[in-house]
Amino acid sequence: MRPDCTDFRQLFLDDVPMMDMRAPVEFAKGAFPGVVNLPLMNDQERQKVGTCYKQQGQAAAIALGHQLVSGTTKQARLEAWAAFAKAHPDGYLYCFRGGLRSQIVQGWLRDEAGIQYPRVKGGYKAMRTFLLETTQQAVEQCDFVLVGGLTGTGKTDVLHQLDNVLDLEGHANHRGSSFGKRATAQPAQIDFENQLAIDVLKKRARGIGQFVLEDEGRIVGSCTVPLELYQGMQHYPLVWLEDSFTNRVERILRDYVVNLSAEFKAVHGEEDGPRLFAERMLQSMANIYKRLGGERHQRLSEMLREALQEQQRSGAVDLHRGWIEGLLNEYYDPMYAYQRAAKAERIEFAGDAVEVREYLKARALREPRK
């Protein structure tokens, strides 16, 4: 039999298959990419056992657990665990602390299905701690540089051409702006942190010691950048991306209208997709009402509404340029100009997409890798 595992680094580097014995409510709060939730107890059973433990102690709680997970319920779950184990002979199982739940499942698999299947010692909690420490160590030991620029300059496009990027918006499934929500939901905060840490781990294992980040706020949609990383972002050097106003408008039109509306159709269907896209865009505009002021918000909202109606009627997106131009001129550009002035001392290079990309590639080569 393979031994139980304590090599968390290799588990994540190799994307080792794992099944999670925790209840669905625990899994939903935070898990690891690619892991399958095959719980020993469902949420209701876990709650009953927890109440019993508080009132009558461990022995009574264990007895109740065995009573709740018995007969056909136990058999169905055992079959699911056995199927996973057979499909993934190199995998592992775990529970919250690597204790009773995973040991019970291990025992049932061994005694009733004839399968010897190892567990992760320390369970979810130990692996989660390892990933938190991974991010912390990278902040302490690695070199970081930020890419900033006005809205629509294509910062994400440039980042995706680099092999040493940490894509905060990608991990958060959000574009980072008031209009940044995607057609699919954002991950739970813990999932966001875990995905980011695994990304760091894999890149450092490839010898990367310098990371490029987009210059973000602390909050990316509903996801919060880890505090130690965000604190570092307040003083990391900055590379400023520049592009013409016309190009920026066209890029925003592509990303936030053409591509996003197509994404809504793909996710929600031809009928509901356009309606939900329009609702999302109008809500995004409503979210910045206070920052725009009443008159400006009303004017830009009306332009957006007319553009959405024309898009739904004919498929044409030309009218969207009007509110995009207005929002850039009257809101985003003045805000970014103020932010750039505040960060001027940290800007070490400025240029267009090609120049910035080449600068960052050259910069990565001349910096020591850790």
Swiss-Prot record:
Reactions mediated catalytically: 5-methylaminomethyl-2-thiouridine(34) in tRNA + selenophosphate + (2E)-geranyl diphosphate + H2O + H(+) = 5-methylaminomethyl-2-selenouridine(34) in tRNA + (2E)-thiogeraniol + phosphate + diphosphate; 5-methylaminomethyl-2-thiouridine(34) in tRNA + (2E)-geranyl diphosphate = 5-methylaminomethyl-S-(2E)-geranyl-thiouridine(34) in tRNA + diphosphate; 5-methylaminomethyl-S-(2E)-geranyl-thiouridine(34) in tRNA + selenophosphate + H(+) = 5-methylaminomethyl-2-(Se-phospho)selenouridine(34) in tRNA + (2E)-thiogeraniol; 5-methylaminomethyl-2-(Se-phospho)selenouridine(34) in tRNA + H2O = 5-methylaminomethyl-2-selenouridine(34) in tRNA + phosphate
InterPro entries linked: Rhodanese-like_dom (IPR001763), Rhodanese-like_dom_sf (IPR036873), SelU (IPR017582)
Active site location: C95 (s-selanylcysteine intermediate)
One of the protein's GO biological processes: tRNA wobble uridine modification
Enzyme class: transferase
GO molecular function: transferase activity, transferring alkyl or aryl (other than methyl) groups; tRNA 2-selenouridine synthase activity
Annotated Rhodanese domain residues: 12-136
UniProt entry tagged with the keyword Cell inner membrane: no
Protein origin, superkingdom: Bacteria
Keywords assigned by UniProt, alphabetized: Selenium, Transferase
E.C. number(s) listed in UniProt: 2.9.1.3
PANTHER family named in the record: TRNA 2-SELENOURIDINE SYNTHASE
Function recorded in the entry: Involved in the post-transcriptional modification of the uridine at the wobble position (U34) of tRNA(Lys), tRNA(Glu) and tRNA(Gln). Catalyzes the conversion of 2-thiouridine (S2U-RNA) to 2-selenouridine (Se2U-RNA). Acts in a two-step process involving geranylation of 2-thiouridine (S2U) to S-geranyl-2-thiouridine (geS2U) and subsequent selenation of the latter derivative to 2-selenouridine (Se2U) in the tRNA chain.
Assigned protein family: Belongs to the SelU family.
NCBIfam families, A to Z: PRK11784.1-2 (NF008750), PRK11784.1-3 (NF008751), tRNA_sel_U_synt (TIGR03167)
Quaternary structure, from the entry: Monomer.
Name of the protein in question: tRNA 2-selenouridine synthase
Gene name linked to the record: selU
